Amino acid sequence: MSTKNGSVGILVANRNQRKFVLKQYLQSKTMHLKLFCFTPSSINWRRKRIIGLHRSNGRWVVGYFPFPQVIYNRCYDTDPQLIERLGAAIGVNKCFNHINQFSKQEIYTNLSKWLSDYLPATAPFDKENAVQLLKTHKDLYLKPCYGHQGKGVVRVEMQASGEIHISRHYFSPEIIFQDTQQFQESIQAILGSTPYIMQEGIPIQQVDDRIFDIRALVQKSENGLWSVTNLVSRIASKGSFNTSIYDKACLSQEILNRLYPPYKANRIIRSIYDVSLRSAEIMDENPDYHLGEFSVDFALGNDEHTWIIELNGKPQKTLYDGIRKQSVVYMRPMQYAQYLCTH
């Protein structure tokens, strides 16, 4: 099948992001692709042209482009109407990661059909059920249904005395309620009108007395099939439960090798690979999504069990900048874009 113009457009939120994002993908660009970066406001629908930034003869150049054959969406929380219009212009399933802001409740519902053993108890927030879950688990995380990077997350912990401690980002409490009645009377004012979920708190493994996560980056490659690109861990700042506030990022293998003998570390890694790929298969079953990549954040329980904490539809690529030999992180989306050009 012909590749037509073989062009790929990377959609970003604003003009200031164009050069930074494009530079990352040009370094590992697949052959025979013309790559440019554009924003929603740079589309001229009447003339069917796009103003985009590209690299030409060693220079950064802004120019006019026809609609590309494939669009890679790196614009978070994209307007659905924009995606629908782009799909009508370039063809069905030629824009990938068009939905990249996931509903945590919807993801939980989808994954729980097949992966319930790896999911903490999760439900839409309401005051009455929150108290029941607190009595059962003693530790809850309240999360915005559409949140990211730990923003808006509230940790709720019930003490043996009956006190309820409320904290954000760090374990130290910001607010202390004397009992469940005080909690129920006040928690909605803390959360506001944003829809929240509540998630069971898991007693998780630490390294150097710090929380860490394991992020599996799952990407499609030149054959359109899923694979796990790497596992990277963020080690949270001292006293923080939010790994988006981290002091160090490294390959997860390094941490697991410190905590466990090789056979246990390898068993944990195999489990994470298997669960991540199963998650990808489940996401592909939903016709509303067309993903070329996403990440799965895991927590490791004290009993060595792996728990899915959340899925991210716009993986943070700067996380990999200090990690050696990670150019494949940027290469894979271009390989998948080339696959879409020919299929």
Where are these regions (language model features)?
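Extreme N-terminal starter segment of soluble prokaryotic enzymes
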Residues: 2-8
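Conserved N-proximal alpha/beta basic substrate-recognition cap immediately N-terminal to
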Residues: 15-129
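Residue-level signal for well-ordered, solvent-exposed loop/turn and beta-edge residues enriched
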Residues: 59, 224-225, 305
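Rossmann-like NAD(P)H-binding beta-loop-alpha module
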Residues: 117-154
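Short, solvent-exposed loop/turn elements at beta->coil junctions and helix N-caps
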Residues: 127-128, 201-205, 295-297
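Phosphate-binding site of ATP-dependent enzymes
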Residues: 135-139, 146-147, 151, 158-248
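Active-site and channel-lining beta-strand-loop segments
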Residues: 217-218, 295-301
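C-terminal active-site "lid" helix and adjoining low-complexity regulatory extension at the edge
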Residues: 253-292, 300-343
